[in-house]
Amino acid sequence: METFYTCRNDRAFKEVFLNPNNSDLLKALLEFILKIKIDKLEIKKTELLSGNVNIKDKRVDAIVHTGNKKIEIEINSQNKDYLHTRSTAYICNIYQSNASVWDTYNEDTDIIQVNLTWGLGRNNDEMKIYKIMNEKGELYVKNFIIYEINMDYYDKIWYSKNEEEIKKNQYMIMLDLDKKELKNMPKDKIVDKYITNVTIVNNDPEFQKYMSEEEDKKKIQNSLLSEAKEEGISQGISQGYTSGI
């Protein structure tokens, strides 16, 4: 049986939400997270500085343009120590690229990063907002904003079986539900369309092939790292004996 990839997976998320035909799904999700009304959005390639393309392992993602905002979305399936450093590097690159477009430096365009992160803990806050400011809370710039969304918080709501809360938070909850769980979700046109599209993506042989190859690469990489670590430990022990330690 083929694996059903939820939108906790970066590739699956992009296939569903960055599809131009699914702009209504992306709009509904961002409106819920940012608590704003979006009249129109446009998905554009990231304007990365040429010298920093490797920052994304040579993959250029998309940025959502809406009104005076440029929004980047990061899918973090696990919470790792390096995440904040990496995410900061991404948004700083976008911030610098945006500043390079204009003849003058200004703060007219909000540069926003939305991190959908699993592994932060179900009992922690649902969201944290980060800005650049001093110890008095005075902003250094007003248009640099990072949202860190605790996706475990929404998993907790799902397993609570509180129908009212599930309905209220359904656009977040649906992102990591498997095929069987999605059938039990309260439905509206957004949820219905999401279910249809994430199913179509998972039924695509090319997508499944890509995901299988990616998982195989990760397994090989993890195996090589494990072997290197074991070899390093063995060498260290051997050198210790040789040195009389």
Residue ranges of model-derived segments:
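Generic detector of well-ordered alpha-helical segments enriched in charged/polar residues
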Residues: 10, 14-17, 26-27, 31, ...
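Accessory alpha/beta interaction modules
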Residues: 1-147, 155
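Generic alpha-helical propensity signal that fires on short helical segments
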Residues: 31, 59-61, 80-82, 88-93, ...
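Short, charged alpha-helical interaction segments and adjacent helix-coil junctions
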Residues: 1-3, 66-76, 173-245
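An acidic, glycine-/histidine-flanked metal-binding catalytic module
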Residues: 142, 147-192, 197
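Generic structural signal for hydrophobic core residues of well-folded globular domains
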Residues: 16, 20, 33, 117, ...
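Short intrinsically disordered coil segments
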Residues: 126-134, 162-169, 213-215
